[in-house]
């Protein structure tokens, strides 16, 4: 896109990949696309050619279905940080052990967990040298070593920062009924 949101270049992703989040890494001159149906990160060059794929886990190879609901990422130098609904891969069994996992881009594998105990996290960001993430279902903005720095009464995602203020979108979660009374979300 240009500054007026005119599409300058585009490319289709592989079939059944469901690209869900994207980040460009200046240090490595690569795009990272989080694909929730693949439980993987696609690495693309500047011309959008797929260079590689990094699996979040091997679970998809055994059961032929995604398990982690990976959705967004941010990268810094040789690491890519991916948010997901379930670190264990059991969100479909109502185990929302959400996390941000670090992927080593040289080794092409998951190497650590940056944050845990998140409920449907989205939009990990590095802002002024610090990590931030939306703990979406709880309606929390996390920062300052992943402490809650803001709480909002709706499902939150789409984090941006202009140097002074944070911006995000609030929406209704599709599965709200089972969460009534558990969190501070009031939108139904």
Per-range role (PLM):
Residues 1-188:
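Sequence-structural signature of mature extracellular/luminal beta-sheet repeat domains
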């Amino acid at each position: 896109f240009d500054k007026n949101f005119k599409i300058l270049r585009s490319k289709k992703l592989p079939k059944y990949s469901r690209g869900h989040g994207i980040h460009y890494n200046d240090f490595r001159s690569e795009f990272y696309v989080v694909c929730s149906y693949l439980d993987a990160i696609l690495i693309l060059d500047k011309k959008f050619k797929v260079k590689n794929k990094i699996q979040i886990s091997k679970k998809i190879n055994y059961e032929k279905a995604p398990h982690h609901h990976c959705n967004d990422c941010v990268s810094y130098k040789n690491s890519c940080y991916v948010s997901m609904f379930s670190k264990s891969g059991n969100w479909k069994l109502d185990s929302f052990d959400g996390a941000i996992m670090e992927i080593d881009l040289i080794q092409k594998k998951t190497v650590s967990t940056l944050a845990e105990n998140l409920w449907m996290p989205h939009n990990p960001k590095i802002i002024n040298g610090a990590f931030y993430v939306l703990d979406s279902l709880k309606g929390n903005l996390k920062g300052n070593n992943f402490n809650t720095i803001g709480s909002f009464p709706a499902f939150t995602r789409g984090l941006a920062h202009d140097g002074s203020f944070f911006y995000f979108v609030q929406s209704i979660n599709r599965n709200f009924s089972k969460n009534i009374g558990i969190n501070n979300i009031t939108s139904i």
